[in-house]
Amino acid sequence: MEQKGELISYRPDIKVVDCTLRDGGLVNNFEFSEDFVRDLYKANVAAGDDNMEFGYKASKEVFNVDDYGKWKFCDEKDIREIVGDNNTDLKISVMADVGRTDFKKDIIPKSESVIDMIRVATYINTIPAAIEMINYCADMGYEVTINIMAISTASENELDLALELLAAQSKASVIYLVDSYGSLYPEQIRRLADKYLKVAEKYGKSVGIHAHNNQQLAFANTIEACTIGVSYLDVTMSGMGRGAGNCYSELLMGFLRNPKYRISPVLKFVEKHMVPLKKAGVVWGCDVQYMITGNANQHPRTAIAFTADGRTDYDNFYTQITSYE
């Protein structure tokens, strides 16, 4: 795939998606203050973001409501308390995990909802169920995207088949390249993005990227993908997200050349909310343990536990992670 634009060029097809509440919610069990959420919404509108992901549409039969904040479930009334009828250009989205969302019960018709987009997330082994969910949501009137998770552990043949099935049989408008473990390097991202774009363009779809920062490559991987034609770019304020976090909103807003995007509202939000959140002890961001799991292409759950235990025995951890019996 040829490069699509230069670093200083303007790309009208680019869409910036703020995932702070959803991916960041994995850090603090979605316990955000009303002021935080309302100010985040206002900041995204002012910054020119295209989409704000409010959280998960998780099943209350699968997850105990008392264990999480409201953005784990994203009830319609809770979103409307923040956005009203959302008379802005910012679109509202939620994520629905295959097998963890009672989608036929909890996803109401678009005509009754302020939500614009459902972001379905699946693993390679649940593609048929994902297609069913995608098409159901599309038939209810929503825009739908699909995140294929943990692709760094899938075989080339599995990924090729998954992409073809999703592109040909689902009504998703965007297929996301997801670096779940933060293990991929820019050269790999370029090759994968090329693969995704070729399939997507054949079926009239777009491609997005959701990067993790285990090896401090989330921003680099995002702009690498963007350069060759990926258009939906996921970010979070100060990179807030599970484990090592994600691509920083501040970095991407400083990079993009589209005059509709403004960095000042992002910086003001970071100053008001993200700095105090860090000082209050909410932990995320790249650290040695996350680098180790990313380098080993492993889920960060062990690094998250390492962090929670206050450990600093990095060499022992590295030996544990890389030992094969």
Question: Can you say where each PLM-predicted feature lies in the sequence?
Answer:
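Catalytic cores and adjacent flexible loops of soluble metabolic enzymes
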Residues: 1-325
